[in-house]
From Swiss-Prot:
Belongs to the KptA/TPT1 family. Its EC number is 2.7.1.-. The lineage of its organism: Bacteria, Pseudomonadati, Pseudomonadota, Gammaproteobacteria, Enterobacterales. This is Probable RNA 2'-phosphotransferase. InterPro entries: Ptrans_KptA/Tpt1 (IPR002745), RNA_2'-PTrans_C (IPR042081), RNA_2'-PTrans_KptA (IPR022928), RNA_2'-PTrans_N (IPR042080).
C-alpha cells in the first residue's frame, strides 16, 4: 500500500464523500441506483476537476477508513459510499434486518429542542443513521458540537412494523424515529 499523509487521506475521504454521496455531477460522474461509480472514470473526472486522485490513494482511503465509508465492487472496478447519500440518483437496496433492543443516535445539544418536537428525521439524507453502541454515537455527536446520545427503542419500533436496515459498515438505518421511541 502506498504511503500517504493523514491530511491527504482526510481530504480525499471528504472529496469522495462529497461526490459519491451528494454531488457526483460536480465532477461529471454518474452513479448507478446502488451508488456505484466506475473507478477509472472517477479518477479521470477528479483529475480534470483539479483533484489529485490515483488508484493507490483510493486503495489506501478504502482500506484505512475507520468508519468504512467506502467499498469496492466484487470485481474491483467500481467504488461507492456505503451509506449517507442525499443524491436522488442513488437508492441502495439494503436488506431489512431486525435491530437490537436499543440503538443510539449522536447529536449536538443545540439540536435537542427540535428533536423533542419532531423526533429524528433524515433531513437531506435518505435515512436516519443510528449506532449500535453509545461510544460511536458520542463520536458522531461530537462532530457537530457538544455531544448528546439519545437511546432509540429499536425493537419496539420494529415490533410496530417500522423497518430497519444495516449498511455493510455496521451503521443502522431507518426512515424516521418518532419522539415516543426516544429516551433522553
Amino acid at each position: 500500500m502506498a504511503k500517504h499523509n493523514e491530511k491527504e487521506l482526510a481530504d480525499t475521504s471528504k472529496f469522495l464523500s462529497f461526490v459519491l454521496r451528494h454531488k457526483p455531477e460536480a465532477i461529471g460522474i454518474v452513479l448507478d441506483r446502488e451508488g456505484w461509480a466506475d473507478i477509472d472514470k472517477l479518477i479521470l473526472c477528479a483529475q480534470k476537476a483539479g483533484k489529485r486522485l490515483t488508484r493507490a490513494l483510493l486503495d489506501t482511503v478504502v482500506a484505512t477508513s475507520d468508519k468504512k465509508r467506502f467499498s469496492y465492487s466484487s470485481d474491483g472496478r467500481c467504488i461507492r459510499a456505503v451509506q449517507g447519500h442525499s443524491t436522488s440518483q442513488v437508492a441502495i437496496s439494503f436488506a431489512e434486518k431486525t435491530p437490537p433492543q436499543f440503538l443510539y443516535h449522536g447529536t449536538a445539544s443545540r439540536f435537542l429542542d427540535e428533536i423533542k418536537k419532531q423526533g429524528l428525521i433524515a433531513g437531506d439524507r435518505h435515512y436516519v443513521h443510528l449506532s449500535a453502541d453509545e461510544a460511536t454515537a458520542r463520536k458522531v455527536g461530537a462532530r457537530h458540537g457538544s455531544p448528546v446520545v439519545l437511546t432509540v427503542k429499536a425493537q419496539e419500533m420494529a415490533k410496530r412494523g417500522i423497518p430497519f436496515w444495516q449498511a455493510e459498515n455496521g451503521v443502522w438505518l431507518t426512515s424516521t424515529v418518532a419522539v415516543e421511541f426516544l429516551e433522553w
